[in-house]
């Protein structure tokens, strides 16, 4: 897995919906928290679409043999929420990445070469501040 910074802005209607809930000034606190979690889940799903390591594997089914996709669990995944809102985004993201290691104090000093790092941050940045 190559190390690179990628910004993904998926044109998904559910992402647009939850982003609208976050931006609306009259959104109640409980709905705001739900919107952050849902946005975290959908953005994580979309960000991993072409990035999550996987392999094709033959599998037996009731109708005969076929080929399926299996996620490679050998590549460690790290999740780093930037406080405070990043933790709420991670609450949604962990539904997609339940096996990811949580990094609450920044990136560990030593990580494996093939490790993937997903940063959960609730701010828009110019790319130089991350």
Q: What are the language-model segments listed below?
A:
Residues 1-130:
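PRPP-associated nucleotide enzymes
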């Amino acid at each position: 897995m190559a190390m690179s910074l990628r910004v993904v802005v998926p044109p998904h209607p559910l992402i647009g919906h939850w982003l609208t809930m976050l931006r609306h000034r009259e959104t109640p606190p409980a709905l705001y928290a739900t919107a952050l979690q849902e946005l975290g889940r959908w953005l994580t799903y979309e960000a991993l679409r072409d990035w999550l390591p996987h392999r094709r594997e033959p599998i037996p089914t009731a109708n005969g043999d076929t080929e399926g996709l299996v996620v490679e669990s050998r590549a460690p995944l790290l999740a780093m929420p930037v406080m405070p809102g990043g933790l709420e985004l991670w609450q949604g993201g962990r539904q997609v990445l339940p096996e990811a290691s949580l990094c609450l104090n920044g990136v560990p000093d030593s990580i494996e070469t093939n490790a993937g790092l997903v940063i959960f941050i609730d701010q828009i940045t110019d790319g130089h501040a991350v």
